[in-house]
């Protein structure tokens, strides 16, 4: 079937996010043909840049459990784990809600003008974090400023990859976002090692210097793709149409529930391991196992999504995460906890990378994909902000017994899976591959 003969539900989105004239690295004017989507070297260089971005940004966030344990036991000893979890939750909240601003900004100014200041703010946030001694200081530096920096880096990257890929969008996004899993493995190990040998301040400063080595080349590799001939250069926003699109609203609610619970194990699994007799080092390594599984999951779900349907795969991933979390009631030995962390990483791997691909698939007007991704992530920010503190409060209320914690996490992920499946049915009730 030719490209022009595809049905709307089969048509993989071609985004028309505009590129300003001032950012004309590549010109699509008829005299300088645009590099091909999916296959050109230029397109895959954007993916490489995305991997380099997500290694220090999302990867560092995936290692927050190491900081959580250190703050509870050392720097902020005496402060409840629920209160400390707000630091990591603020990062997620600002990363998500930042899409309301950064998404439309990307449509107007392109990638470079967001990635460069985002990189500067990222490094400054870590340098300020390195001198923090009190809780409120960490909230401001590691929570708020670092979260804003992540938003400036996350959305231009994921929007640019959506522009450069069509048929292979799933695997392209999976490969790029797998950088966060590789980063999670690296940061989990190196942070704990440095904390043991050089202390908190120089550990965080060293993280800033290492991150800079990844951020600089990514700012060069990631560029906005100009619109193709015939594509709209201006956003045609109709908020009434967006907010009355049933399949989009259902998918957004599903992702809110999924992201409400998905990040909680990344914050608390080391503490869970210590509860059941694992050493501090062994418990911290659970994050490395989880991120290793996440790397496999992101690549695997990207490949599966392009072949079996993106909504099908993301729904299956969310359902699997919920089932695994309920299994924690019976998982109390070191070997079983390690197996859980790896499997959870695999199943949760595609939940971030496939979101934008799903939005693109149900967006007929490709000039507003960036806005719709930003609106959805802004909506999901509520879950990112409150999920871990609520789970921590349940843990404290149960006197460090994990029953309520597990039931909360598992229930909201299962609920998110059900709503996501419903959105898939509304979007394409008669097609198996969607």
Curated annotation (Swiss-Prot):
Cysteines joined through disulfide linkages: none
Origin superkingdom: Eukaryota
Basic and acidic residues compositional bias, start-end: 1-13
BP-aspect Gene Ontology terms: secondary metabolic process
Segments of this protein annotated with the region Disordered: 1-34
Record-level GO cellular component terms: plasma membrane
Subcellular location: Cell membrane
Induction: Expression is positively regulated by the cluster-specific transcription factor pynR.
Matches recorded under Gene3D superfamilies: MFS general substrate transporter like domains (1.20.1250.20)
Pfam families given in the database record: MFS_1
Any one GO molecular-function label of the UniProt entry: transmembrane transporter activity
Family, as annotated: Belongs to the major facilitator superfamily. Monocarboxylate porter (TC 2.A.1.13) family.
PANTHER family per the UniProt record, alphabetical: MONOCARBOXYLATE TRANSPORTER, RIBOFLAVIN TRANSPORTER MCH5
Role, per record: MFS-type transporter; part of the gene cluster that mediates the biosynthesis of pyranonigrins, a family of antioxidative compounds. May be involved in the secretion of pyranonigrins.
Protein name stated in the entry: MFS-type transporter pynF
Organism: Aspergillus niger (strain ATCC MYA-4892 / CBS 513.88 / FGSC A1513)
